[in-house]
Design a protein with these regions (language model features):
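Short beta-strand/loop element within the Bergerat-fold HATPase_c
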Residues: 64-74
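Acidic ATP/Mg2+-coordinating residue in the GHKL
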Residues: 82
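Glycine-rich ATP-binding loops of the HATPase_c
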Residues: 125-131
Length: 148
């Protein structure tokens, strides 16, 4: 897939709408008001967002999600915050490895989700990290260079 101009704000908006359809009880909001554009692979970026939302709901029991994108001189930062049970700090790095599953994960899963997230971040020349969220759960932070 080629790198094309992607409107990240619009991508997050669509992901939010689809998430509410998949999880009717979920409160999903988008923090970004300004348009954030970058060169990227839309399908891959969308996969990352959908994955973070699914993880938050299935494994963290999240009821609230906040999506955000910010652009700066350093590039673009996309964050997915949730109010779920969170991922213990000592496991935040390991869960990105293939087939790894966090000790707090509630349902069976392939354990491939976050490995795919890490792979997409790498393909975009950036990084993916799990952090503590201001909402009380987990924050997935995707930090990508704006241009490739």
């Amino acid at each position: 897939e080629d790198f094309v101009p992607v409107d990240i704000t619009e991508l997050l908006d669509r992901a939010a709408h689809d998430a509410v359809r998949s999880y009717p009880d979920l409160d999903v909001s988008l923090k970004s008001s300004t348009t954030v554009l970058m060169l990227g692979m839309p399908a891959g970026l969308r996969l990352v967002i959908d994955n973070a939302i699914a993880n938050a709901v299935k494994h963290g029991g999240a009821t609230r999600i906040l999506l955000s994108a910010e652009s700066s001189a350093a590039g673009v930062e996309i964050t997915v915050d949730d109010n779920g049970s969170g991922v213990p700090e000592e496991e935040r790095q390991a869960v990105f490895e293939r087939f790894a599953r966090g000790s707090t994960a509630t349902r069976s899963g392939s354990g491939l989700g976050l490995a795919l997230v890490a792979q997409q971040a790498e393909l975009h020349g950036g990084t993916a990290a799990l952090e503590a969220s201001p909402l009380g759960g987990t924050r997935l932070a995707l930090r990508l260079p704006g241009t490739h």
